Amino acid sequence: MSRIGKRPITIPAKVQVAINGTNIVVKGPKGELSRTLRDNVSLSQEGEILHVNRRDETRTSKQLHGLSRTLVANMVEGVSQGFQRRLEIQGVGYRAQLQGRNLVLNMGYSHQVQIEPPDGIQFAVEGTTNVIVSGYDKEIVGNTAAKIRAVRPPEPYKGKGIRYAGEVVRRKAGKTGKGGKK
């Protein structure tokens, strides 16, 4: 029995939900999201409460029950509050800046790396070393933040690179010398 799938989803006042079979459209102040769920689950709405139900007790239905509920809950939260992901840049000379909507990264390469935001995504830069990726679709926010981090992932010896805020980088010991030249 999926404990996550059994939890009801509360719909905020400014959010409208339209259910058409396995299709769901969620509209809110931040934007509009739609998704087609699998046939193994069904949606039912009672006032401001949304329930995700299984159609049968097969193993696949049980697996998709909690997943579908979480996806719908993320849609509701995204269009009402939105999501954001913070990234930190560490390293001498590494910095970020905005050019229009695009994010420009100086990461020690011979060229600047320009990242164009997908639809519904905004970049913000605090100082020159903190980047905030925000939007209403949790999946796209996470994928965009992962693309930015992939430009220069943190290396294990000095920890230089782009990391998520609060990420702990596993450090390695460097080479130990023999005691000098002879």
UniProtKB/Swiss-Prot annotation:
It comes from the Bacteria. The keyword Metal-binding does not apply. One of its GO terms (molecular function) is rRNA binding. InterPro entries: Ribosomal_uL6-like (IPR000702), Ribosomal_uL6-like_a/b-dom_sf (IPR036789), Ribosomal_uL6_a/b-dom (IPR020040), Ribosomal_uL6_bac-type (IPR019906), Ribosomal_uL6_CS (IPR002358). One of its GO terms (biological process) is cytoplasmic translation. GO terms for cellular component: cytosolic large ribosomal subunit. Signal peptide: none annotated. Keywords: Ribonucleoprotein, Ribosomal protein, RNA-binding, rRNA-binding. Pfam families: Ribosomal_L6 (PF00347). Coiled coil: none annotated. Part of the 50S ribosomal subunit. Belongs to the universal ribosomal protein uL6 family. This protein binds to the 23S rRNA, and is important in its secondary structure. It is located near the subunit interface in the base of the L7/L12 stalk, and near the tRNA binding site of the peptidyltransferase center. HAMAP family: Ribosomal_uL6_B (MF_01365_B). This is Large ribosomal subunit protein uL6. It comes from Nostoc punctiforme (strain ATCC 29133 / PCC 73102).
